[in-house]
Amino acid sequence: TIVEPILSEQWFVKMDGLRDLALVLMENEGLPRFWPEVPHKKVYTSWLENLKDWTISRQLWWGHRIPAWYDEAGNVYVAETESRASELALGKSLHQDPDVLDTWFSSALWAFATMGWDGEVVETEDLRTFVPTDALVTGRDIIFLWVSRMVMMTKKLIGCHPFNDVIVTGTVLGKDGKPMSKSRNNGVDPIEMFDKYGVDATRIYLASIATGADIRWNDLLIETYRNFANKIWNAARFCLLNSGRS
């Protein structure tokens, strides 16, 4: 398939002001805190410092529709609803922009949009209780796509940060060294691992990975930990049998 780039009109969000909100939050309050701090804090701030304007329109079949309508002359009307856009257009015939929002734009609103925020109300019981939340656990590959954008959007729209701590996990890779996915068919069923090697062996294998590091799946290592666990089990049984306890 030939991929041919073309010029087209898109919707952008100017990021200068949003970026500054996140950078000032980190500089003045040290938030959010990254675990592990190295290298993720530096990666996060460096990306913000070099941030470009964000293209938020996508030519996809699914997603949140862009709330913009056009009349026959090409004038644009941005509104919460089609009826409101029609009022702004003084009853002119309108058609909605066919594009949808970038999924990360929608996801950036998650911290507060799920807590009763409707675009105006910024004080609900859920918002007071859960924003900011204690911690977000996420992969290092979406620090830019999700974490930074949640910080910027939450700070901009409701005036506080979305979470205090970000716990960064590694990515689980298949035996081929690529991220596990259904499309690659390189995933493993953890239940099968439990049945084959035991829960303890699988847990030891996962616990042996350095914090925040990627995991390249290796059945041989799990088998090694199973053999080790068997030795501990047999040694414990021997001690208990000879101590008169069961």
Please tell me what each predicted stretch does.
Residues 59, 240-244:
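Long, hydrophobic, amphipathic alpha-helical segments used as structural scaffolds
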Residues 1-72, 107, 142, 146, ...:
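Residue patterns forming the tRNA-binding/recognition surfaces of aminoacyl-tRNA synthetases
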Residues 59-63, 67-214:
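Alpha-helical recognition segments enriched in aromatics with Gly/Pro capping
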Residues 4, 113, 241:
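Short catalytic/ligand-binding loop motif for oxyanion handling, primarily in non-cytosolic enzymes
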Residues 223, 243-246:
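Conserved nucleotide- and phosphate/pyrophosphate-binding catalytic cores
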